[in-house]
């Protein structure tokens, strides 16, 4: 089962709905859930978006403790938390709209971007963003608005996206989530 960590984002229910449409077992759980409870039940973990890093509950601990055990996908805030956990830099994106249609260039088609074209249109939030990826991570997508639209670990199944694949406005969003479900052994 894929467990979706709820960081109080407005779209968390759409992540589960996408998995439901695929027939993939998924459950939304509070970000206060103990990492050990997540470990016992998860074939994979999605760290959802949300309004602030200060309200991320145990999301950082879940990333730290489950790294190398199950695939983890960070979306928006989850992407930023993953970067922070591994030593990357996250900062405010001055002068950027909070949500915007963004053309994203896929630089690396491994993992969650397998089978996707080189460019997609995505719905993204850029209030905060990853400014520097951690060591052992590579940038897998970029845009004119954000140099780190997505990243992945060089060896472990850790993926982060600044944009929202769960939204219908994001081209190939369901394909990204389907690729993640495959990495989790759910498809």
Curated annotation (Swiss-Prot):
Q: What Pfam families does the annotation carry?
A: GATase
Which EC number(s) does UniProt give? 6.3.5.2
Please give the InterPro entries that the UniProt record associates with this protein. Answer: Class_I_gatase-like, GATASE, GMP_synth_GATase, GMP_synthase_A
Keyword field contains rRNA-binding: no
Residue span(s) of domain Glutamine amidotransferase type-1: 1-187
The residues annotated as the active site are: 76 (nucleophile), 164, 166
Per the record, what is one GO cellular component? cytosol
Which keywords are on file for this protein? ATP-binding, Glutamine amidotransferase, GMP biosynthesis, Ligase, Nucleotide-binding, Purine biosynthesis
Subunit annotation: Heterodimer composed of a glutamine amidotransferase subunit (A) and a GMP-binding subunit (B).
Alphabetical list of PANTHER family matching this protein: GMP SYNTHASE [GLUTAMINE-HYDROLYZING], GMP SYNTHASE-RELATED
Protein name in UniProt? GMP synthase [glutamine-hydrolyzing] subunit A
From which organism does this entry originate? Methanopyrus kandleri (strain AV19 / DSM 6324 / JCM 9639 / NBRC 100938)
């Amino acid at each position: 089962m894929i467990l979706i960590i709820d960081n109080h984002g407005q779209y968390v229910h759409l992540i589960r709905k996408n998995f439901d449409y695929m027939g993939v077992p998924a459950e939304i759980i509070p970000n206060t859930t103990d990492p050990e409870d997540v470990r016992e039940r998860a074939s994979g973990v999605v760290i959802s978006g949300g309004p602030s890093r200060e309200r991320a509950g145990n999301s950082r601990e879940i990333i730290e403790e489950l790294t190398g055990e199950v695939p983890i996908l960070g979306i928006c805030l989850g992407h930023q938390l993953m970067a922070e956990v591994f030593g990357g830099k996250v900062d405010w994106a001055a002068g950027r709209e909070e949500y915007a249609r963004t053309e994203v260039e896929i630089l690396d088609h491994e993992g969650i971007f397998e089978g996707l074209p080189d460019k997609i249109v995505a719905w993204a939030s850029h209030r905060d963003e990853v400014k520097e990826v951690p060591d052992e991570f590579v940038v897998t997508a970029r845009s004119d608005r954000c140099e780190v639209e997505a990243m992945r670990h060089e060896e472990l199944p850790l993926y982060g996206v600044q944009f929202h694949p769960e939204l219908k406005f994001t081209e190939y969003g369901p394909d990204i989530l389907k690729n993640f479900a495959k990495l989790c052994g759910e498809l």
